[in-house]
Amino acid sequence: MRISIVGITGYSGMELLRILLQHPQAEVVSLHASQDMEAPASELYPHLKGICDLKIEAFDSQEIMRRADLVFFATSSGVAKDLSKDFVEAGFPVIDLSGDHRLPGNIYKKWYQKEPAEDYVQKAFIYGLSEFTDVRGERFIANPGCYATATELALIPLLKARAIELDFIIVDAKSGLTGAGKNPAASSHFVHVHDNYVTYKLNQHQHIPEIVQQLQRFDKRLQQIQFSTSLIPLNRGIVATVYSKLKEPLTREELAAIYQDCYQDKPFVRIQAALPNLHQVVGTNYTDIGFDYNPVTNILTVVAVLDNLIKGAAGQAVQNMNLMLGFPETDGLLSQPSYV
């Protein structure tokens, strides 16, 4: 499978390249930046010397379709919605890691403050939460966001089991700094984030409508969630702590069964006996989930952790590619956590 990557200079693009270079059925044939830039990848990123010496090329949709079989967009929001149009019209497979094709146009415009993709382009894409979306044979996949992936994987089993009250769902999500992207900003300067804890976009994060939209697939009565996001001074990782009230008390064994039944055939979701931590998943495509129930308050706390650049971005994109094309789901994705 010949692959082109657009958006190679960002964190997710570089992680995507790293994974695909080790994929047994993928050949990366071209690298592109969303802005004009022509230089060997190993010149910009010396860690690639002797590993990948492909030249970063200007974007040309026709040239990509001539040389590749599938294109990944690992671009900032607002880019892929325009650049993907030629591929959609040609029926050429696209996996978009940005938020450009996850939401209906009017909702995208409200939350991203950008003009949306043309309606026929947006409607061509299917939302690719790998564990709950059948993408076999699809051509256009909108890869989920990092916060959204962690939150949805934590909550969907409970919604499927009709186990929780829908008017009390609180998500406190924290991300490492790569989640803020590569473009420099005062909010991600070292002196601002080092030895600090910064809450941002309270009630305004663009993943909120994405999460609600997907949770409604499993219970249409759900209307809203309370969602907060914070930056923590780490390179990688998402920790989503999710609070909900049970409709009726459940034992730990009953709660574990809800999650085990949902994920028993899902290789990248692990249900842990203890509350998980980031060292268990950083550098991998795993999401680890743990929980604890307080019978005094009737509040269930679920903790989901993942690597925002892998399961929250590039890894899930490759997982979707595998499922789309009928490859083994785990191809290229069985790296182990470094742990320390």
Swiss-Prot record:
PROSITE patterns: ARGC. SMART domains: Semialdhyde_dh. Pfam families: Semialdhyde_dh, Semialdhyde_dhC_1. The active site is at C146. Its main location: cytoplasm. GO terms for biological process: L-arginine biosynthetic process. Its EC number is 1.2.1.38. Catalyzes the NADPH-dependent reduction of N-acetyl-5-glutamyl phosphate to yield N-acetyl-L-glutamate 5-semialdehyde. It comes from Streptococcus sanguinis (strain SK36). This is N-acetyl-gamma-glutamyl-phosphate reductase. Belongs to the NAGSA dehydrogenase family. Type 1 subfamily. SUPFAM superfamilies: Glyceraldehyde-3-phosphate dehydrogenase-like, C-terminal domain (SSF55347), NAD(P)-binding Rossmann-fold domains (SSF51735). It is an enzyme of class 1 (oxidoreductase). Keywords: Amino-acid biosynthesis, Arginine biosynthesis, Cytoplasm, NADP, Oxidoreductase. The keyword Cytoplasm applies. GO terms for cellular component: cytoplasm. GO terms for molecular function: N-acetyl-gamma-glutamyl-phosphate reductase activity; NAD binding; NADP+ binding. It is found in: Cytoplasm. It catalyses: N-acetyl-L-glutamate 5-semialdehyde + phosphate + NADP(+) = N-acetyl-L-glutamyl 5-phosphate + NADPH + H(+).
